[in-house]
């Protein structure tokens, strides 16, 4: 059975890789542009862009793309551009298997819990290999730049210090700089709880940003979500930054204390946990429908059962 690379649902007769409605959501066109590269011939281009790092997201090639409009009768295609591209492509890596499938699935799981994410999908290289693609929210349709600053910048830390700090500190920065601080603080803690539930220990300072799409600074839609516990099972840390002074052996009381300290009341905190509890069945369905290999399906199911029991049933 052929499935849509965007929504994981079965394709209809004559459809290739995407439903038309799904292609429009990510590519703003009913037909997906072609991606005329393979992993082998893109490696040299990737080396020019990727900075050396030992983190999962750091070792992923992040290539800036835009859509080249073909002449009459020719299909649109993606081309690698400079920093001003409207799309970011993450190919497979040699070190960690199935990161594109992992990230796309985890982003869908966030959406199922009511978390707003950047537009994203899987896409194929010319040889059929799957990649992850996302459309940037800090670019206009014409390629112009929308002001955006991550928490490294707002906390005046260097990029290499992105793992230094706490989630409580990010909440304070959101309260200080957001035009809608109460809403954005709730949205922020939703992402932190979701990341813990899905085994994501890589949500560092650069993975949270404020942007200004319409004369107000707001928390951006969520990006860079993936399960590092599935990709790197040897890592025993549960979070990238500290929560209540620690990165592992986290429990519900740690989250509740941090949320209260940032201004959330008990009713809002309770609703947040209830929302995730309701999303668990949909998460299991998405995992089963995803493009991850069957073995990783099983590992993800098992992890969600474990983390949800620890956090949502206490």
Predicted regions and their residues:
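A residue-level signal for conserved active-site and pocket-lining positions in enzyme catalytic cores
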Residues: 65, 110, 151, 202, ...
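C-terminal regulatory or interaction extensions
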Residues: 145-146, 152, 226-234, 263-265, ...
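Conserved kinase catalytic-core segment
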Residues: 95-112, 161, 166-230
């Amino acid at each position: 059975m052929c499935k849509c690379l965007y929504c994981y649902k079965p394709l209809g007769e004559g459809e290739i890789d995407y439903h038309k409605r799904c292609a429009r959501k990510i590519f703003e066109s009913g037909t997906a542009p072609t991606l005329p590269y393979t992993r082998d011939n893109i490696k040299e281009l990737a080396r020019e862009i990727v900075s050396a790092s030992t983190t999962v997201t750091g070792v992923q090639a992040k290539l800036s793309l835009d859509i080249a409009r073909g002449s009459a009768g020719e299909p649109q295609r993606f081309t690698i551009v400079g920093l001003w591209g409207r799309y970011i492509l993450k190919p497979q890596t040699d070190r960690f298997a199935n990161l594109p499938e992992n990230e796309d699935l985890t982003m869908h799981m966030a959406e199922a819990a009511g978390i707003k994410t950047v537009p994203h999908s899987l896409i194929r290289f010319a040889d059929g290999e799957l990649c992850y693609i996302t459309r940037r929210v800090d670019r206009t349709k014409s390629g112009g730049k929308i002001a955006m600053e991550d928490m490294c910048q707002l906390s005046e830390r260097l990029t290499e210090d992105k793992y230094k700090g706490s989630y409580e500190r990010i909440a304070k920065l959101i309260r200080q700089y957001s035009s809608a601080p109460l809403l954005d603080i709730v949205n922020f803690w939703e992402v932190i709880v979701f990341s813990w539930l899905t085994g994501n220990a890589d949500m560092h300072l650069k993975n949270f940003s404020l942007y200004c799409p319409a004369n107000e600074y707001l928390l951006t839609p969520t990006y860079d979500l993936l399960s590092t516990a599935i990709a790197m099972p040897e890592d025993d840390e549960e979070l990238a930054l500290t929560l209540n002074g620690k990165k592992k052996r986290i429990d519900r009381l740690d989250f509740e204390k941090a949320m209260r300290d940032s201004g959330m009341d008990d009713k809002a905190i309770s609703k947040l946990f209830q929302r995730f509890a309701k999303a668990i069945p949909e998460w299991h369905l998405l995992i089963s429908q995803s493009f991850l290999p069957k073995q990783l399906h099983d590992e993800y199911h098992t992890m969600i059962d474990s983390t949800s029991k620890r956090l949502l049933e206490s």
